[in-house]
Amino acid sequence: MSLPKCDPVYKATIIPRGGALGMVVSLPEMDRLNYHKDEAKQKITMTMAGKAAEIIKYGEEGVSNGPAGDIQQASALARAMVMRWGMSDKVGAVDYAEAHEGYSGNTGGFSVSAKTKEMIEEEVRELIEEGYQEARRILIEKEEQFERLAKGLLEYETLTGEEIGKVIRGEALGGDDDTPPSAIPSVPAIPRVPPAGQAPVPTA
């Protein structure tokens, strides 16, 4: 919706599953063979939305470990962009992935200098921070729509992509979705369900 380069949302649920307190499942419209830079950056934004939503709703001190999986996913994608895919102007089109194991800088005869290691980390952090700030901007800008989504998830627990569209537009749903949560691996986890009386925080 706000991130057109991301895969369409197939389903969102606040039902705990597989160690996650909820999940958003995205499915590509066709088999993906490659990533473009703008697509990868938007996926990082989508992945960081859970953490951004928690901070907006509960403040810096109210953030939980709920978005931990999202942060790991965003970090892995940002590292791939910088270290393997040549998507950093500063680092250049060099594959540093082989030297990443343990970040010792000396793996299989391939060395990475301290300066290069620091530059890689700076680029990875910059990509993640940029994604976080963009997710935060979207959530604040579209506060009304995402409050509707939060209430819809609280009421129905699981929503399909089509139902999510209806909910954020303020349209009534035809009936409950009794389909159990998909077993497909998730993209970002929805943050923890807050204490009674508070609405859950949706992701972008």
List each model region and its residues.
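Soluble catalytic regions of large protease machineries
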Residues: 1-204
